[in-house]
Amino acid sequence: MKTHSLRWSFCSTARTGKPNNSKQRLRKGLLLVIRKVAPISVAAIFYALEVSITRKLKNYTPTRFMEKTSHYDVDAADYAVMFIESLCHTKGTWARKPFELIDWQEQIIRDIFGVLKPNGYRQFNTAYIEIPKKQGKSELAAAVALLLTCGDGEERAEVYGCAADRQQASIVFNVAADMVRMCPALSKRVKILDSQKRLIYQPTGSIYQVLSADVGNKHGFNTHGVVFDELHTQPNRKLFDVMTKGSGDARMQPLYFLITTAGNDTKSICYEIHQKAKDIIEGRK
């Protein structure tokens, strides 16, 4: 089945300068965002868009890579943004303060959740985000996981938090659990099973569950969402393939949210995706 794809590049030249090659891009923190859309056309089409990071999105413009048959649903986008901004930061001086999305974060959320196909389902179903350290990666990933679990209107949604090991995967989970505890509306409806690293949204029977790179029993999922944290640390591509190839076929709009800081293993699945994004951005695909 053929797919469309969208590639974004967010490059903070003020902080890093513009890197000249892929290794520099990995070292200096080029922000690459890839989105793979639901099957539409005969040939895979890839796009690239470069956006600078600013404090707050002043005027949102829907991605120019929206399909002609798709549309921007402002209500759907506003809902996603408002859901996330009803959550709180969980650590340090920002703890318990509202999670106000900054420019590049809001652009991502509005394009993912606001660009819809004629049937009302999301056009884009995969996001790859590569960002420097200390840019709020865990908070954004946790917020997206909660939105997919609790706010996406999906019955019995299965949302999985994946990483190289259970400890790494638990980082985003722990942030999500704290966000739930700080949100009265969610804390009344979500059961937190810390020992199992599982959240249950009781009104729909939906779950958010931590998984690690041990793929021996990682089959048979009916995935509505996957949040892959620190993709560059995956020891191989097995977990990535299990969780992204076919696991969401029974869902109408699964979302694979891949987020990572930079790595240097040129044989990793993360580098493979990074290179695909680089090719798209530089017009080779």
Q: Language-model segments: which ranges?
A:
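Phosphate/NTP-binding elements of NTP-utilizing enzymes
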Residues: 1-5, 10-17, 21-25, 29-285
